[in-house]
Amino acid sequence: MSFEFTVLSDDRFVEILEAWVDSPWPKTAEDGYALRDHFGWRPSENKPNVFTSDVVPDELSASFTSRQGVIGSFDFPITDIAPEEAWGYSLEPAKVIYRHFCEILTRRYGKAKQRSSKKERYRSTFVTPQGVGVKVGGNDALVSCIVESPEEMFIASEYARLVAKGYISEDE
């Protein structure tokens, strides 16, 4: 089966990074709604933090999480989703797209702080000077990006530190 991903343009990716990643943190849910509207993404009727995206404009495909009105993470697709029958063929094109977006992030934020790859799943984590995490990754069905607030990144690093010191076990 032949399938070609719809891919977010480099310029639009950088525009999203500048608005969501490089601008001041913490961000409020109201900031998230304003950014959603700025980019022209349409919200769910009953969950305004879930909305459409550039590469999947007809489906609710992006979202942000918030606790007590403060954003913890923002998740958006870099590609559309490959149909299930294409998954065996779409892994290599997805990895090419993933590597391309990793190069963009490397130019902006330096080398990835963490990389992982298990079978058809892959992910790289970049950290900005202000402590914002940018994770790009995917599988044979899609490539996506997750932006994590400095607070979420701190919590994750503290958890990893406590596991490494043996104070807590990995599954707690």
Predicted feature descriptions by range:
Residues 125-130:
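Active-site beta-strand termini and strand-to-loop segments that position acidic
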Residues 1-120, 131-133, 139-172:
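Short helix/turn-capping signatures at newly exposed starts of structured segments
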